[in-house]
Design a protein with these regions (language model features):
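Helix C-cap/helix->beta junction micro-motif
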Residues: 30, 140, 195-196
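Hydrophobic/aromatic beta-strand patches that form the interior of the parallel beta-sheet core
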Residues: 36-38, 124, 145, 201, ...
Length: 257
């Protein structure tokens, strides 16, 4: 066997597992305490009725010869892809259903998408960041440029013309800070990516939490983004069913890398 030695560069344990272990230990020794859980972004309410009813119908369909099916289409259910494309119309973003790819969730896709770029790439990650970004790129053997953020830039770093990368991760609203890029700030990143032939991986998992009308939910609300960006979203957050594993990725036909 030829091992992937990049695994040895990972931290000893996954961040959320480490937090869960510390939480369990604390509650065992302080049984009367209540902890506000600020770790993994899990839900606190049961699935809504519409989701539960749809799951039941789907299971029942598998028990009848007339409605049973095996594998779904490779890129996802056509009706779901069309519905997702229609969802973007609310933000005046025009997508074709064939530009939408249904996945088993954003966490998996944020790592799997790297297979499109080959190996030995330079990747830019804004810190603090969702742990999956770093772990996936360590495993892939990519070079990582960590872009710091803090009070001085509102946790929203902007492009540095002296630095270049092949792939740039942007999460807005950010996990874990909650900071959100406005249109002008995202336009700077889009123009920068187009200038240096980079691809923006836009993590829109928390887009449904945006309340301000003038804040973009999608990178594709920004002019020029379709030639440089891929967007990944999670129904765990949008529809509130973590653990059900459903998300999607948008890759525009205009992407020219």
């Amino acid at each position: 066997m030829i091992p992937n030695t990049n695994y040895s560069e990972l931290k000893d344990s996954y961040l959320f597992y480490h937090i869960a272990q510390k939480t369990k230990a604390y509650l065992n020794s302080h049984p009367d305490s209540y902890l506000y859980r600020m770790g993994i972004g899990d839900v606190s309410l049961p699935l809504c009725d519409a989701v539960v009813e749809a799951l039941h119908r789907a299971v029942d369909d598998q028990s009848q010869k007339s409605t049973f099916h095996g594998y779904m289409p490779e890129c996802g259910d056509p009706g779901l892809r069309e519905t997702i494309a229609d969802y973007y119309k609310k933000r005046k973003v025009s997508l074709l259903p064939e530009e939408v790819f249904v996945s088993s969730g954003a966490s998996d896709e944020l790592g799997d998408i790297l297979d499109l770029f080959g190996r030995d790439k330079t990747v830019m990650i804004m810190e603090p960041a969702y742990p999956a970004y770093v772990d996936a790129n360590i495993i892939a053997g990519n070079r990582i440029i960590h872009i710091p953020s803090g009070k001085e830039n509102g946790f929203l770093p902007l492009p540095d013309e002296t630095t270049a990368a092949d792939v740039i991760y942007i999460c807005s609203p950010n996990n874990p800070t909650g900071a959100v890029f406005n249109c002008e700030q995202l336009k700077l990143w889009v123009d920068y990516a187009n200038r240096i032939d980079a691809v923006l991986l836009f993590d829109a998992a928390y887009e449904a939490f945006i309340e301000e009308e003038d804040i973009p939910h999608s990178i594709f609300e920004i002019e020029g983004a379709k030639t440089c960006a891929i967007e990944i979203c999670s129904l765990s957050k949008t529809a509130g069913f973590t653990g059900t594993r459903l998300g999607y990725t948008v890759i525009p036909k205009e992407l020219n890398r």
